[in-house]
Amino acid sequence: GSEMCIRDSHCSFSWASEENTDFIDTHFSTVQWCISSEGLYYSVNKKGARAYGGAWGGTSSTYHHNLFAHCNSRTPLMNGARGKDPGQDIVVYMEYINNVNYNWGSQMATYGGMDESQDPEHHGWSCNFVNNYYKPGPATTARVKELKFFRQSSAREPNKAPLRAVSKWYFHGNVMEGNSQLTSDNWEGVYTDGNYPYSIDEMKASSFIIPSGKENYEQYWFDWESYTLSDQYESAEKAYQSVLADKSGAGAFPRDKVDARIVKEVKSGLCTYTGAGDANSGAIPVSYTHLRA
């Protein structure tokens, strides 16, 4: 944690035993045009089934035009303002814009936002979740009972780290392919876990969130107007096309065989591999056996 001024662009991450990518407790970071795909379902991880896309967070961070594909969960886990250990965030401001999520396999695939920092300088958690494209795949259809964009989580350890405040969200323009209700009203696709003490209405921001607290928190100050995507983003449908574009989309170029296959599967709505004991998931089993869906 505590790394500063990070930019990951046109990278490809796959086949990890925990999360494919971790960008948490960072300051002034951008992750753009990257692919996170095919996490290992059952591998060397003693915790059991994983296949996680990533844990993303950080103070003043932007995530745009990235692709999650064939990951069971954490697509992404949005890391909270924890502030429990040295280097952890006491404030989180995120822009999560124009990303594509395909074939997730867990009901709470995108979740997080815990605002639990006990630091006296705690300053809250906020996110602009705008114009992202969700496309259910074979694993989603088989395993997810109710489609959702996001689940707001409570504290990791409720008895030790109670929530300090409600996390603030601006949900706008997100598309759930095949579901007109969630597409027209994004907040219908947001829910909370059973321990969260705040209501959905309390989470809502009515317009694009602008970071606050510059005067009191100089270490988190940045020239927001120069770096924000608030007036530069595409529609979710256009972002879907941009992310999957053959010569200018997400991933490292020229795309290798893995990334080329991943993009083809997103377009076709199919998958190649199955997680161990889980038909049509898209996740990679520990044996790496080539199983056709």
Label for each model-derived stretch:
Residues G275, N280-A283:
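Eukaryotic acidic, serine/proline-rich intrinsically disordered low-complexity regions
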Residues R7-W15, H27-K46, Y52-M78, R82-S106, ...:
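Right-handed parallel beta-helix
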Residues G1-D8, T289-A293:
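Conserved small/polar residues in nucleotide/adenosyl-binding loops
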